[in-house]
Structures are given as structure tokens and as C-alpha cells.
């Protein structure tokens, strides 16, 4: 009999693992992920968390071994391209792009090499762990190159004489700089995504997903929003409201003992910069507070 516990695969270590754990916690899942176990059970919901290698997650989701997976778009796209080149079917459903795991896949060359565009690497040796994405980029340019497949430490390839350039994930660029390389072109930008198995799930599992998705959406909206409170003169309300970025219609309340002053409360979907606060003050606003929001649900 098929278990009715929802199975979610996540990366077993690294930054994406830490961000996934934080997401589970913020969604109210009680789970002990400190012990090095393959499967961890959520205490307050019928969910099991599987911790695996990131490049195993797309296959586990597609084959229905797990119901959901948290994976970088770069890994997902690479697996899809490689399978397509081998004539193997691949289908998963992306439920939501998440607000973490951001990175970019970039070309990099030695510092002393002049780069004038992708054509300057035509016919050159390029080391990478993402041959599918790299080939697609050069195919779209109508250019050929020699792929040097490396599973790790791609950045040392030019210095070791294995390649003329590299194509690797970049976050700060510090690793490239330490190896005498410079980033010259971004070929793919990626974030983490929540993906689902292609086949329909049971009603019980779908109900769990329908509970999780609004929580994830609420957490992401909360991180992107601020709660703003201020006092404002009545005759300046329109001008003050126009200054609040991405704001919905505000809540207006009469201040006790004040006939010309009101309290204004609003959720803003954008950052309120110091310059905006100074403009609000210049219009007569006072007691301006900008507060973080922990959770939201529309």
C-alpha cells in the first residue's frame, strides 16, 4: 500500500540545504535535520524529507520516488538537456520559483586573455560541469568548442593546462580571482525551484501540497514587504500615499485628540529607502516606523 506521507527531496549539504531547512522551519514544519539520516520525519505533518545529492533530485522526482523536490534551476535544466541529447524522456512540473539559491553560470578566462565575445572562444577547450547548458549557449551562437568535462575544481583547469577557459557557477567571483580568472559572460541565471512529480498525486498528498504552497508564498511575500506606520497631516495624505512604493490602499485612523492628524498603516512591497523617508518627513509625516513582516497570507 502506498504511503500517504508526502516525500520531499532536498540537497543534503551546502547553502541550498541550509536555505531549504530555513524554508521548512518558516512554514511551521517541526523536523530534526541535525542527525545525518537519509530520511527525516516531520513531526506535525505527514511529510518525510529525503536528503540526497542535488543531481539525483530531478530523477527521483521524475520517477516518482519522491513527490516534490527543491533543486537549482541550473541542475534541473542541465539534467533535462543531457537526457534529451540521449533520447531519454524527462518531465517534471515546476510549482514555484523560490527566493533563494540564486547563482549564475558564467564563462571565465585567464586574466591576461582578451575576450571580445563568445566567438573568441570558438574551437577552444572549455572546462565545465554543465556541458548541456554550455553546448546550448554555443549552439545558439552557431559556434563550436571542445568540452572538457570536470566534476569539480573547474577553476583550476586553465592553470593546469587542461582548458583555455571555464564555464562554472559564480556567486562573488572570489574563487575566480584567486585562480587568476575573470568572469566575461553570464550564460544562465538560476534560482531554487520547487518541482513536483509529473503523475497525479493522491488526494491526501495533494491536500498537503495545497497547505504548503500558500505558506511558502506568504513567507516570500513577507520577506519582500515592510509594514509602514506613520502620522500624517490630513491635507497631505494623497501626496504621502503616492510616495509609498508598491503600497496597497492604506489603513487610515484618526489620532486621539488630533483633528488634523491621522495614523497611516500600510504594507509596502518594496524597500523604503532613506530618501523616501526624508521626503515623507518633508511633507509633514512624523513617527515613521518601517517594520519587517514575519508572515503574510492574503
From Swiss-Prot:
InterPro entries: ATP-PRT_HisG_long, ATP_PRibTrfase_cat, ATP_PRibTrfase_CS, ATP_PRibTrfase_HisG, HisG_C, N-reg_PII-like_a/b, N-reg_PII/ATP_PRibTrfase_C. GO terms for molecular function: ATP binding; ATP phosphoribosyltransferase activity; magnesium ion binding. SUPFAM superfamilies: GlnB-like, Periplasmic binding protein-like II. This is ATP phosphoribosyltransferase. Pathway: Amino-acid biosynthesis; L-histidine biosynthesis; L-histidine from 5-phospho-alpha-D-ribose 1-diphosphate: step 1/9. The gene is hisG. The keyword Oxidoreductase does not apply. HAMAP family: HisG_Long.
Amino acid at each position: 500500500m502506498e504511503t500517504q506521507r508526502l516525500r520531499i527531496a532536498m540537497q543534503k549539504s551546502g547553502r541550498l540545504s541550509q536555505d531549504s531547512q530555513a524554508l521548512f522551519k518558516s512554514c511551521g514544519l517541526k523536523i530534526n535535520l541535525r542527525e545525518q539520516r537519509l530520511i527525516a520525519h516531520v513531526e506535525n505533518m505527514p511529510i518525510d524529507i529525503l536528503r540526497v545529492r542535488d543531481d539525483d533530485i530531478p530523477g527521483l522526482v521524475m520517477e516518482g520516488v519522491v513527490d516534490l523536490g527543491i533543486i537549482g534551476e541550473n541542475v534541473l535544466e542541465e539534467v533535462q538537456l543531457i537526457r534529451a541529447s540521449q533520447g531519454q524522456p524527462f518531465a517534471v512540473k515546476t510549482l514555484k520559483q523560490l527566493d533563494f539559491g540564486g547563482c549564475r553560470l558564467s564563462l571565465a578566462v585567464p586574466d591576461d586573455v582578451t575576450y571580445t565575445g563568445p566567438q573568441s572562444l570558438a574551437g577552444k577547450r572549455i572546462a565545465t560541469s554543465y556541458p548541456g547548458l554550455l553546448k546550448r549557449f554555443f549552439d545558439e551562437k552557431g559556434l563550436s568548442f571542445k568540452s572538457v568535462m570536470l566534476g569539480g575544481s573547474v577553476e583550476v583547469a586553465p592553470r593546469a593546462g587542461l582548458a583555455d577557459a571555464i564555464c562554472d557557477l559564480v556567486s562573488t567571483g572570489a574563487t575566480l580571482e584567486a585562480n587568476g580568472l575573470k568572469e566575461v559572460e553570464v550564460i544562465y541565471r538560476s534560482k531554487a525551484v520547487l518541482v513536483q512529480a509529473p503523475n497525479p498525486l493522491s488526494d491526501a498528498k495533494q491536500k498537503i501540497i495545497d497547505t504548503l504552497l500558500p505558506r511558502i508564498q506568504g513567507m516570500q511575500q513577507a520577506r519582500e514587504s515592510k509594514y509602514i506606520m506613520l502620522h500624517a497631516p490630513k491635507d497631505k495624505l494623497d501626496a504621502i500615499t503616492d510616495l509609498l512604493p508598491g503600497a496597497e490602499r492604506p489603513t487610515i485612523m484618526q489620532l486621539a485628540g488630533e483633528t488634523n492628524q491621522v495614523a497611516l498603516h500600510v504594507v509596502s512591497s518594496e524597500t523604503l529607502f532613506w530618501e523616501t523617508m526624508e521626503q515623507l518627513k518633508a511633507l509633514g509625516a512624523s513617527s515613521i516606523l518601517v517594520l519587517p513582516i514575519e508572515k503574510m497570507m492574503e
